[in-house]
Amino acid sequence: PTEGSITIAGSVPGPATKEIVSYLPDAAWLPDWMRVEQLVEMFHDFYADFDPARAGEMLAKLELDPKAPLKTLSKGNKEKVQLILAMSRAAKLYLLDEPIGGVDPAARDYILHTILSNYSEDATVVISTHLIGDIEPVLDEAIFLKEGKIFAHRTVDEIRETEGMSVDEYFREGFKC
């Protein structure tokens, strides 16, 4: 798109909106030299809504060592740490870019469970992904972009009822090569 505007909760993106948005990028962005526990401390210092106890619980469930330097973790475990940090905030808006893209299929279920059981009840969760089939069970709505424009914006129930297909099938049909 060449024009338009973006607002978050009625405000132009800036320092105030960063307080209510928890963003998980699709690429590793945390300093590799830091230990996991230092990252938890950093997030606690930066974000008033960060819950270090929640982060600790999730790290323990995944058997991730808080004392481990990030650089010693596998790619999948680094992504899990990033997800834990993002989901340990009580944000109003969670923007998750390809949260299951780099992890093995067995870990995907845990990640989806982590997302669903750790976001604030009054929050909105936006997940950007190409792995529609894996996240379809947790979707309420789907927005499909094609060549920079909204191709479709519908509830998943509407897609299933009116199109007679799953959201994944609808996606594949709309984006055939």
Place the predicted regions along the sequence by residue.
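A short, surface-exposed alpha-helical micro-motif characterized by mixed small hydrophobic
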Residues: 135-137
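Catalytic Walker B motif of ABC-type/P-loop ATPase nucleotide-binding domains
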Residues: 94-98, 103
